[in-house]
Regions:
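Cleavable N-terminal signal peptides
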Residues: 9-10, 20
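N-terminal signal peptide c-region/cleavage motif recognized by signal peptidases
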Residues: 15-19
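Histidine-/acidic- and/or cysteine-rich, low-complexity loops and terminal segments associated
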Residues: 21-136
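Bacterial N-terminal signal peptides that target proteins for export
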Residues: 1-8
């Protein structure tokens, strides 16, 4: 009986240890900064440990001026991105295609008027509108 009790505790301890191992939280990141005349430039960073192809990002009513092929930099595939919009990104939609349950996307936009926007896209909410009024 004594050995059975030890065995049960060891078995339960090992089972709990295996269950508590989690996947590393390593989200994709979109970082943009506003330039003159509705231009934005920044980085699209997608984790190298994600399953499948990198997710795609798109912007409503904006033209993509540049996006280089991704390069591995540390834990990320990094692409330089440049877009041109008729107006500010405020009030416009950003959409992601190809996010997974394990890969969310953090979005950070810095505007010329010193305001900024931070957002999160997930597989359940892959697109959102940047509000007209954003934080300082």
């Amino acid at each position: 009986m004594k050995y059975l009790t030890k065995f049960i505790f060891i078995f339960l301890g090992l089972s709990f240890a295996l269950l508590t191992q989690t996947h590393e939280m390593n989200p994709a990141r979109l970082s943009l900064e506003e330039g003159a005349n509705g231009s934005y430039s920044g980085l699209w960073m997608f984790p190298t440990n994600a399953v499948g192809l990198p997710a795609e990002v798109s912007f409503t009513n904006c033209n993509e001026e540049k996006r280089n092929l991704p390069e591995v930099q540390g834990k990320y595939l990094v692409s330089n991105i440049a877009i041109n919009c008729d107006e500010s990104l405020k009030g416009k939609e950003i959409a992601f295609k190809g996010l997974t349950r394990l890969t969310d996307a953090l979005v950070s936009v810095k505007f010329l008027d010193q305001t900024s926007f931070e957002g999160l896209a997930t597989i359940n909410t892959p697109k959102f509108d940047i509000p007209q009024e954003v934080s300082i």
